């Protein structure tokens, strides 16, 4: 796809995510998202803002990552995953109360929580000292995803 249309917004967004999420080449990925976002005809810029926000936060640039995730929501208020990633960003930044607020918004928007959702909810609850809520997330994770990497991470810390 790249060799056919190297300026394609969709191709650049997808390649940027591949660089960031699969290869760990986070800094390099940001240029690809910028190319995608520079295309005024790109029908889903909210996805590029979302991806760039996650990758920027992985560089420890939390304020910029937060701004990008909020741009994702502004571009498409129905794009539910952005609130989850804002919760994760705030958690990684050490702001558990803000993480909890974003996670509750996210939780109200989804029908069923994934293993990753439950782990994040558990982490936030633990950090907030909400042990009953943390136990509920753990119970759901054990019941619904007994062989998941997320449960392993919860129980072993790895």
Please tell me what each predicted stretch does.
Residues 1, 35-38, 71-72, 105-107, ...:
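Canonical positions in the second alpha-helix
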Residues 4-5, 39-41, 75, 108-110, ...:
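Structural marker of alpha-solenoid helical repeat scaffolds
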Residues 14-15, 51, 85, 120:
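Canonical tetratricopeptide repeat
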Residues 23-35, 59-71, 94-101, 132-136:
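Structural signature of tandem alpha-helical TPR/SEL1-like repeats
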Residues 105-158:
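Terminal, low-structured helical/coil segments at or just beyond the last alpha-helical repeat
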């Amino acid at each position: 796809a790249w060799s056919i249309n190297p300026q394609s917004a969709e191709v650049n967004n997808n390649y940027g995510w591949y660089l960031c999420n699969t290869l760990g080449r986070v800094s390099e990925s940001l240029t690809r998202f910028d190319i995608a976002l520079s295309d005024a005809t790109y029908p889903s810029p909210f996805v590029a803002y979302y991806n760039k926000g996650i990758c920027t936060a992985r560089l420890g640039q939390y304020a910029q990552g937060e701004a990008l995730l909020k741009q994702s929501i502004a571009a498409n208020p129905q794009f539910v995953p952005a609130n989850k990633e804002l919760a994760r960003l705030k958690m990684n930044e050490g702001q558990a109360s803000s993480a909890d607020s974003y996670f509750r918004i996210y939780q109200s928007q989804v029908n069923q929580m994934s293993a990753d959702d439950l782990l994040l909810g558990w982490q936030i609850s633990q950090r907030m000292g909400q042990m009953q809520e943390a136990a509920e997330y753990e119970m759901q994770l054990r019941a619904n995803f007994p062989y998941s990497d997320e449960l392993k991470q919860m129980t072993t810390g790895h």
